[in-house]
């Protein structure tokens, strides 16, 4: 007996109890897949959808189909299709990273970047939605950075993760590296065309994670630094075609930029200690408009007795309110009846309206401000540093772009 779901994934619009699904152009096996990742103020939604079965998947699924009626079929073709999809979905991008990769290890069980492949060719899409979440008109299919090479039988896809109020989207696309074969790189989508953020061959992987209404995008790029594959945060001006990498907490710190607001404040996650074998990471805030600005550890912006260790900043709005992921110690009773402590992942909301204008140095009893050469002006410090007010805490459902 087998259970077959109606689809792999569906992009869902939800508002006040109303739910609308977005269906893909191609649904031949397992119902296809769609995702809605972002929506702007005009109801223009960004995401991706299956558009065709890949050549490799067609071949593998065909191998599961008997050529004659006498062959005993032990499982339906849907089981074969699902096993193929599951294997591709969890495959690692081993061609880009021959070394162990400790930072951001949740990308795959082996610690490497997930290739996040599919039985389908997938394309980034923009859907115009009405007030009820229904698609208006014809969706806009987005391109890839390069066309698929003739001998490449794998899925070849693009993905839109963010869209601004000017209709410019950002995300990822498969492309080709001269030495590494197929890789995923950051892409900007303008009028359906996929545009590269960089063509520098030192970069092996990357993504655009957000774009503001000034057409400045942010995300990460992966490159080999000191014989290790590490990520570097970046901002990219679409109008000026200018890429700027972020400094990180220290030289060689793996950094991922997750979001940028219209004031140019970037938030994300980065390694904070260069000397440890297993590097801890922290959520950061960075003013990309300030010359010589340095990363601000968000743990320095909350009170020293706060029970949270902020490990990642996920988003920031134009009021400076940050949604972040934190660890919180929690006691529990084990099977032997003993009290134990474990870290629980929670989401915290940080509000700059509670600013006190000082960074906390929790190693000093007097809790004095130790700026260590930070170059942000006093106005910025007052506006963004004092994020001491914890507004709400709730369980996090994480989203990862591989």
Predicted regions and their residues:
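N-terminal secretory targeting and juxtamembrane "stalk" segments of secreted and cell-surface proteins
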Residues: 384-386, 399-402
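Residue-level hotspots at or immediately adjacent to binding/recognition sites across diverse folds
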Residues: 1-380, 391-399
């Amino acid at each position: 007996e087998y259970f077959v779901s109606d689809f792999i994934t569906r992009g869902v619009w939800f508002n006040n109890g109303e739910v609308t699904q977005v269906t893909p152009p191609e649904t031949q096996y397992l119902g296809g897949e769609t995702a809605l990742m972002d929506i702007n103020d005009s109801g223009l939604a960004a995401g991706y959808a299956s558009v065709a079965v890949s050549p490799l998947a067609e071949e593998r699924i065909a191998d599961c189909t008997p050529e004659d009626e006498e062959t005993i079929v032990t499982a339906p073709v849907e089981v074969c299709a699902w096993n193929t999809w599951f294997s591709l979905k969890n495959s690692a991008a081993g061609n880009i990273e021959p070394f162990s990769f400790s930072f951001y290890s949740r990308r795959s069980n082996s610690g490497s970047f997930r290739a996040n492949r599919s039985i389908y060719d997938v394309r980034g899409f923009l859907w115009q939605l009405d007030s009820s979440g229904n698609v208006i008109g014809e969706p806009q299919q987005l391109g890839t950075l390069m066309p698929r090479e003739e001998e490449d039988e794998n899925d070849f896809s693009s993905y839109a993760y963010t869209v601004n109020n000017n209709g410019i989207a950002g995300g990822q696309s498969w492309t080709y590296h001269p030495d590494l074969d197929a890789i995923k790189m950051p892409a900007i989508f303008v009028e359906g065309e996929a545009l590269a953020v960089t063509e520098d061959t030192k970069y092996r992987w990357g993504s655009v994670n957000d774009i503001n209404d000034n057409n400045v995008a942010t995300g990460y790029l992966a490159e080999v630094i000191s014989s290790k594959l590490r990520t570097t945060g970046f901002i990219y001006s679409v109008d000026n075609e200018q890429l700027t990498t972020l400094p990180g907490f220290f030289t060689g710190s793996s950094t991922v930029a997750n979001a940028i607001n219209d004031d140019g404040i970037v938030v994300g996650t980065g390694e904070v200690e260069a000397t440890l074998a297993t590097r801890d990471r922290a959520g950061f805030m960075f003013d990309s408009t300030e010359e010589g600005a340095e990363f601000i550890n968000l743990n320095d912006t909350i009170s020293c007795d706060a029970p949270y260790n902020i490990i990642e900043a996920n988003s920031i709005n134009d009021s400076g309110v940050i949604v972040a992921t934190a660890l919180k110690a929690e006691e529990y009773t084990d099977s032997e009846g003993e009290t134990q402590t474990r870290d629980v992942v929670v989401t915290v909301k940080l509000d700059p309206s509670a600013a006190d204008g000082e960074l906390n140095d929790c190693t000093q009893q007097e809790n004095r401000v130790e700026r260590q050469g930070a170059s942000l002006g006093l106005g910025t410090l007052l506006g963004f540093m004092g994020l001491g007010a914890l507004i709400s805490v709730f369980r996090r459902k994480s989203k990862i772009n591989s």
